[in-house]
Amino acid sequence: MTTFYDGWLAASANAQKAVEHAPALAKGSDLNWIETPQDYRIAMLIGEQVGFPTMGTSLMKAEIPAGHHTGKHQHGEEAMHMLSGTGFSVIDGRRYDWKPGTTLHIPFMSEHQHFNTGDEPALYVSAMSMDLDLFVHLGRLVQLEEKGKNATDVESRFGKETSQFADDGRRIALHPEDWIDENARREAQRAAAASSAAHGNGHGHHGHDHGHGHDHGHGDGHGEHGAGHQAHRHGAIYILMGGSESLSDETNGFQAKAVAITNIFEETPKTRSHSHTHTEAMLYVLEGSGYSEVDGKRYDWVAGDAVHVPPKMTMHEHFNNSEQRTRTLRIEFGIRYFYEALWKGFHKVEHRLTAEAIA
């Protein structure tokens, strides 16, 4: 007779096998586009439904035709990044405008709908933890309205945008002109610290901790030297929603808990990023071509592809072997940090702290 304990043992073995033999690359050219009551075109990039073992998380890509809108629905937290098109979203009754490069946060169970008011399709990537929400029986997916063609008075019906922030003070929308250049800010901090020391006023600069209650001092050099003294991990880092791996605790006013589109990483031609090991994260390739090494295996990518770091201690780094810059969008999920705080062995490990040139 098979017992529940036998089932747990079998599930444990299957989970280990799944992450040890997990795919790491989703090709944008191979997506299976579908139509739903909510979306005209949507495809799963990374998720259990397309063969990636995740922590109940997913990354999708969707398209809104010109002059149309999505359905209106409610569900758990969502992070979105607009790739093309112009329009606005109505979230809990308030309008938030968007354009290419805008990052949006949908709070837990907020009513929301997206309107393409431009003359070209609007494309965006979306990250959620829907499978996790439903597994713990706290999440819901409530369809309130179906997709359709915009009304002729769509622009006036919802009024003008009055703020990028919700009534409770949290940020909902962030435009490219408001991205924070983390490397530039660290250089400014470094210069200020050097100037202060030269005038005899310095007491040492220790930078920021991550502001999330995690211990990141496990051989990564952050605790001793701080952000002001460490060389750069990428050619450029732009802070969007901020995250638990950032050298800064800056969140740009977002209050994401379950999912965040944290940063844009830029690698200059013929360079590679820092090398490290941690559990689940995702990258979406915005621009350029290159490759990632995940547990020693090479995965070549181009714009539109996505990289999955599976939920085990996975060593990885990213390479730009081209003559043009690359930009990738980093996505993290709160469930990762819940488990990292529980399990002492699952802290982030740095193998090489800085980006460097390649042949």
In which residue ranges do the predicted regions lie?
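A short, N-terminal "cap"/entry segment at the start of jelly-roll beta-barrel domains
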Residues: 1-55, 139-257, 343-347, 352-359
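Conserved short histidine dyad/triad with adjacent acidic residue
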Residues: 41-48, 58-74, 241-248, 260-277, ...
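Short, structured motif recognition centered on aromatic/hydrophobic residues
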Residues: 57, 64, 79, 83, ...
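Conserved metal-binding segment of the jelly-roll/cupin
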Residues: 65, 91, 98-118, 127-130, ...
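A short beta-strand-loop-beta hairpin characteristic of the jelly-roll/cupin
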Residues: 68-100, 110, 275-303, 314
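Hydrophobic, ordered structural segments
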Residues: 98-161, 338-340
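Structured core of small recognition/catalytic domains
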Residues: 230-291, 295-306, 318
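C-terminal functional regions that serve as terminal interaction/effector modules
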Residues: 281-284, 297, 301-321, 326-358
